[in-house]
């Protein structure tokens, strides 16, 4: 007789993981990057982050209470705070407060709560908010303050980012290559950009913490970074006067932030290890294609959102093994 019992009877021992525990673990991993942004951007970083987090918490509470008629305890699980921090990390430090609030409203209201809240959203809410602001306010979203203006906010002096210089080189301005910071500067954070782009080292510290705590696995971030390195390396070998080295591609822009904190979102990424690898490779390829051949200097946000849409399809063809399933005898 076939044994149909594929899961053992109770009682079961709880593993200790919970949504709230993992969310606050991610927040701890974000602390190094936040401290670095404070060091380089000062008041602007504090205002942008505080406004984004407060707005996300408020809209999560208000929409849940008055529109969805759901319990408002979800504001305590940490997901809205993470959305606020990640949205802030995708914004320049001189962005006006009212634009930040609009981004938070779109991220929470459209990107998350309109689908039913945490666990139901098909797209990363923070990235949805960033792309909405980028398309709606392109001038404000591409004005990057120069690092070191600790007390300046909206009146901060702006300058070109490494990705903007790379794009100029692709368009034929060979002098732009000499203006791109070296790898050490990009690693430490001495360059302009969004709050979360300034230091690859701080983001790698966060990655190490999350891997240590087993909040995420290595499959998505490593597959993204390796794919970008290989693809960008091929392009650099083909035309080194036009395309920068793969190391500079890895350390510049929002690649590290996206690979570590955005693409690894539980809700919008595949469940199986095989699916994660496919997902990560596709994000890496799309990012390089958009960076080198697209209209925008940065392609990470668009690449992740595109692959978010393919996550259900990847899950369909890369189903994880069911717990307790017995392998078929050959």
PLM segments and residue spans:
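Membrane helical hairpin/interfacial module
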Residues: 35-87
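Membrane-interface helix-loop-helix junctions at boundaries between adjacent transmembrane segments
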Residues: 86-155
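Cytosolic-side transmembrane-helix boundaries in multi-pass membrane proteins
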Residues: 1-24, 66, 292-330
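Loop-to-transmembrane alpha-helix initiation sites
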Residues: 122-126, 246-254, 276, 294-307
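Long hydrophobic alpha-helical segments that form multi-pass transmembrane helix bundles
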Residues: 125-204
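N-terminal signal-anchor module of multipass membrane proteins
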Residues: 1-57
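C-terminal ends of transmembrane helices
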Residues: 58-70, 108-119, 205-214, 260-269
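Structural signature of hydrophobic alpha-helical transmembrane segments
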Residues: 43-55, 94-103, 186, 190-200, ...
């Amino acid at each position: 007789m076939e044994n149909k019992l594929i899961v053992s009877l109770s009682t079961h021992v709880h593993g200790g993981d919970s949504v709230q525990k993992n969310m606050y673990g991610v927040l701890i991993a974000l602390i190094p990057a936040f401290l670095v942004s404070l060091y380089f951007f000062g008041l602007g970083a504090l205002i942008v982050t505080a406004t984004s987090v407060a707005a996300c918490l408020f809209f999560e509470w208000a929409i849940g209470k008055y529109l969805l008629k759901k319990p408002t305890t979800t504001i305590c699980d940490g997901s809205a705070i993470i959305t606020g921090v990640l949205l802030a990390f995708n914004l320049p430090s001189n962005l006006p407060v009212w634009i930040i609030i609009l981004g938070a409203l779109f991220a929470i209201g459209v990107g998350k709560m309109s689908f039913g809240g945490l666990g139901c959203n098909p797209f990363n809410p923070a990235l949805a908010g960033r792309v909405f602001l980028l398309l709606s306010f392109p001038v404000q979203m591409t004005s990057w303050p120069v690092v070191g203006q600790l007390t300046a906010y909206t009146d901060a002096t702006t300058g070109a980012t490494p990705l903007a210089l790379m794009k100029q080189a692709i368009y034929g301005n060979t002098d732009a290559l000499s203006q791109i910071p070296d790898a050490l500067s990009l690693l430490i954070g001495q360059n302009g950009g969004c709050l979360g782009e300034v230091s690859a080292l701080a983001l790698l510290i966060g990655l190490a913490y999350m891997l240590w705590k087993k909040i995420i696995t290595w499959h998505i971030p490593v597959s993204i970074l390796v794919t970008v390195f290989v693809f960008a390396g091929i392009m650099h070998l083909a035309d080194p006067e036009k395309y920068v080295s793969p190391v500079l591609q890895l350390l510049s822009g929002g690649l590290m932030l996206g690979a570590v904190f955005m693409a690894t979102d539980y809700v919008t990424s595949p469940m199986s290890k095989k699916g994660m690898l496919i997902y990560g490779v596709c994000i890496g390829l799309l990012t390089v294609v958009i960076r080198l051949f697209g209209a925008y200097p940065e392609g990470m946000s668009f690449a992740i959102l595109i692959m978010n849409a393919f996550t259900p399809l990847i899950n369909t063809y890369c189903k994880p093994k069911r717990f307790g399933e017995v392998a078929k005898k050959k």
